[in-house]
Amino acid sequence: PVEVTIRGRIEFRHVWFAYENDDYILKDISFVIEPGEKVAFVGATGAGKSSILNLIGRYYDIQKGEILIDGVNIKDIDTDVLRSAIGQVQQDVFIFTGDIKSNISLGNENISMEEIKRAAQIVHADSFIEKMPGGYDAPVTERGSTLSAGQRQLLSFARTLAYQPSILVLDEATANIDTETESLITSALARLMEGRTTIMVAHRLSTIQHADKIIVMHHGQIKESGSHQELLAKNGLYKKLYDLQLVES
């Protein structure tokens, strides 16, 4: 495998993908994401959005086409190197039994206490950690039941940041947050994304309007792409999805 320092340029070239012997979930997908760009994938459930996220970390191999990271075929990059460059933030945050600091560093001894604290400060997690008895040494239990959903989310942002990834993958990262924490989370997310290639999947279109580019998926194909305003002006599928959500909310 090629030794690379990953900057975060991602390219899909005519990618076809299916799980096992199923029908194709992705059909002839091509796009380019430049380093530092924020790109969101939208579309109905089953459109293939989450599959794209799985393929970037090479959790599955594709049947046809190529996926390139910084111009190198993903198959030629050491999987550990590739995955350590990708920070994944998921909707269900797993909290381990231990203390706050080990939940940020995940026990990695290369991450110093100073780095743990800096990561927490950048994403505003320090605001609640420092109020806890024991602070960074405060004990937490497996389900993190002592923490609110918002606090768990901020902790997961700090965990992601401590590993200094060059690519961020956000799968519905702001789905289950109360309004009070939402502004804190939004601002923490913005700081987490700074200078990083970011790929987001979200069902709530309000969370992705500021993306540099939005790619609209439909039945495994790319139907349209552009900025929020460009897509509204096209009056196509994105506009339909957007109008539907306005009605629902």
What are these regions (language model features)?
Residues 3-249:
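ABC-type nucleotide-binding domain
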